[in-house]
Amino acid sequence: MKINKLTLNERKNDILSYFGEINAPCRTSEVAEHLGVSAYQARHYLQCLEKEGKIKRSPVRRGASTLWEISSIPP
């Protein structure tokens, strides 16, 4: 039985493509559903992309869902 495991870079590229398709901020749960992974795993991938400066999270208010979006590219 072959198990298809995507690398971290493949997952991150998939997330960036997803953001490009929807062209709107989205929640961690939406990314998790798109990837078919747990919210915990999706959050890990999103945090990696955030550290790389490729995406950013919206300002978080108490009790509000975290929204993620593509970082604006400087001119």
Curated annotation (Swiss-Prot):
One of its GO terms (biological process) is regulation of DNA-templated transcription. InterPro entries: FaeA (IPR006793), WH-like_DNA-bd_sf (IPR036388), WH_DNA-bd_sf (IPR036390). Keywords: Fimbrium biogenesis, Transcription, Transcription regulation. It comes from the Bacteria. May have a possible regulatory function on the expression of the other daa genes. This is F1845 fimbrial adhesin operon regulatory protein DaaF. The lineage of its organism: Bacteria, Pseudomonadati, Pseudomonadota, Gammaproteobacteria, Enterobacterales.
